[in-house]
Amino acid sequence: MSLVSQIIINADDELRYPTIGELQSIQNYLITGSNRIRIATIIRDKEKEIIQKASKQIFQLHPEYIAPGGNAAGSRKRSLCLRDYGWYLRLITYGVLAGDKDSIETIGIIGVREMYNSLGVPIIGMLDAIQCLKEASLEMLGQDDAKIISPYFDYIIRGMS
């Protein structure tokens, strides 16, 4: 749900108009609208490059993952890891576009830790992978855009911790 929708629903539930603070939040969100669209476009267009950089970094941090018997050993397992990286990037862009973290919570965080545990995927590796995706993404963006997108990566990292 978008920031605007959430504010309206909250105000309606309480039978009131949006507060000054809520209206300011909407105004800030609308002011950054073109930036949010640009960020989502850059991440979409640079997805392969971001994943390539992040995977190189994560496998340098954890070479045991691509060693025989590792969670990303072999082309099939490795491609599944990279698929997940693309999924997380899309999830980040949904949050950026919506202006809140509800879509990340609804689509991606609930149950993900348990899923990875059941599959034998080390959580520390996924946390490191999201951090690597963040760093690779930030290389593609300016400082102002980094301030907008960073909290969404951090939210996923905290949610998986």
From Swiss-Prot:
One Gene Ontology CC term in the entry: chloroplast thylakoid membrane
Modification after translation, per record: Contains one covalently linked bilin chromophore.
UniProt keyword list: Antenna complex, Bile pigment, Chloroplast, Chromophore, Electron transport, Membrane, Methylation, Photosynthesis, Phycobilisome, Plastid, Thylakoid, Transport
Binding site for (2R,3E)-phycocyanobilin: C81
Membrane topology note: Peripheral membrane protein
Record keyword Transport present: yes
SUPFAM superfamilies, alphabetized: Globin-like (SSF46458)
Protein's job: Allophycocyanin is a photosynthetic bile pigment-protein complex with maximum absorption at approximately 650 nanometers.
Record-stated family: Belongs to the phycobiliprotein family.
Name of this protein: Allophycocyanin alpha-B chain
Gene field: apcD
